[in-house]
UniProtKB/Swiss-Prot annotation:
Protein name per Swiss-Prot or TrEMBL: Chorismate synthase
Class in the EC hierarchy, top level: lyase
Positions of region (Disordered): 41-60
NADP listed as a keyword: yes
Keywords of the record: Amino-acid biosynthesis, Aromatic amino acid biosynthesis, FAD, Flavoprotein, FMN, Lyase, NADP
Cofactor note text: Reduced FMN (FMNH(2)).
Matches recorded under NCBIfam families: aroC, PRK05382.1
Pfam family, one: Chorismate_synt
Length: 365
């Protein structure tokens, strides 16, 4: 398995399995001198960790991160930052009934075919448990981006099943267990999730993530366009089946006169492009959305087969999220932060002395 790293100048490599001893990651390329403690990462880890509400998995993991290297006297040294989180609440016996079965919609079958064996305990490496280390690494990137460049990143659940946010109130996002920005829909969300859990089924979701104060110029055309790398990072999150930048698939019905973001010395008139033009950041907010499938780990019986190829019925036991999109919000923030951090360092390496006479545009007020 060789796809465990992301980034060129800010490189994040993760390791570990859902029911293994621990999860870990190595961060290479973080500039020296950044003040960093475990507390800087713990906030986002607590937002992602399981067992924090009745809407998510009952697995309870403290997800307490430890810094192993790369930090001395509270500051990054410029060397590799090693991080680790121990697994403490594994219940591998919950998966003994699927040891020789494939769960429909999961990575069981493809891992078995690719590697000739698989860790059936909670999905092993394919489990979303792995994303805890992405969130930890993303928190490092988020701190640097804000401290050095004033870049802020925030995400929210913009749709759960048929319930869509109609109003975006940023202050509301952290005030409820759904990370939902529209307070008028919270009661409907609660009722929907109650009925969903009773049925033993699951549901998909849409998560939006936004970065503000991003400077002009990030992105490396043609193959490492900023939007391409953002899409790559978000698509690499478990259960994500679609990514949009800006207006995304809505551009299919837009006309050119409607979609183009008109410019004047006063700024851009709109942001249909999502803050990226020609693969390079425009200075407007970076806006991305991702669609997450409903988890296949449900208690409703389904047809499948055994490792030997015999027909079988599967009923998934264990502790699972009825909607994986809820805990995906801090993961999306982390992946966007990692991409922006990487591109900032790449841009600095080649273009830090470039000067343009053209004024930098913002959004019109």
């Amino acid at each position: 398995m060789s796809g465990n790293s992301i980034g060129q100048n800010f490189v994040v490599t993760t390791f570990g399995e859902s029911h293994g001893v621990a999860l870990g990651c190595i961060i290479d390329g973080c500039p020296p001198g950044l003040e960093l403690t475990e507390a800087d990462m713990q906030h986002d880890l607590d937002r992602r960790r399981p067992g924090t509400s009745r809407y998510t998995t009952a697995r309870r993991e403290p997800d307490e991160v430890r810094i192993l290297s790369g930090v001395f006297e509270g500051k990054t040294t410029g060397t590799s930052i090693g991080l680790i989180i121990e697994n403490t609440d594994q219940r591998s016996q919950d998966y003994s009934n699927i040891k020789d079965l494939f769960r429909p919609g999961h990575a069981d079958y493809t891992y078995q075919q690719k590697y000739g064996l698989r860790d059936y305990r909670g999905g092993g490496r394919s489990s979303a448990r792995e994303t805890a280390m992405r969130v930890a690494a993303g928190a490092v990137a988020k701190k640097y981006l804000k401290a050095v460049h004033g870049i802020e990143i925030y995400g929210f659940l913009s749709q759960l099943g048929p319930i869509e946010a109609e109003h975006i109130d940023r202050e509301q996002i952290e005030q409820n267990a759904f990370f939902f920005p529209d307070a008028s829909k919270l009661e409907a969300l609660d009722e929907y999730m109650r009925e969903l859990k009773k049925s033993g089924d699951s549901i998909g979701a849409k998560v939006s993530v936004i970065a503000t104060n991003v400077p002009v110029g990030l992105g490396e055309p043609v193959f490492d366009r900023l939007d391409a790398d953002i899409a790559h990072a978000l698509m690499g999150i478990n259960a994500v089946k679609g990514v949009e930048i800006g207006d995304g698939f809505a551009v299919v019905t837009q006309k050119g006169s409607e979609h183009r973001d008109l410019m004047s010395p006063e700024g851009f008139a709109s942001n249909h492009a999502g803050g990226v033009l020609g693969g390079i950041s425009s200075g407007q907010p970076i806006v991305a959305h991702m669609a997450l499938k409903p988890t296949s780990s449900i208690s409703i019986p389904g047809e499948s087969m055994t490792v030997q190829g015999n027909t079988a019925e599967v009923v998934t036991k264990g502790r699972h999220d009825p909607c994986v999109g809820i805990r995906a919000v801090p993961i999306a923030e982390a992946m966007l932060a990692i991409v922006l951090m990487d591109h900032l360092l790449r841009h600095r390496a080649q273009n830090q002395h470039v000067h343009s006479e053209t004024p930098v545009l913002g959004m019109r007020s």
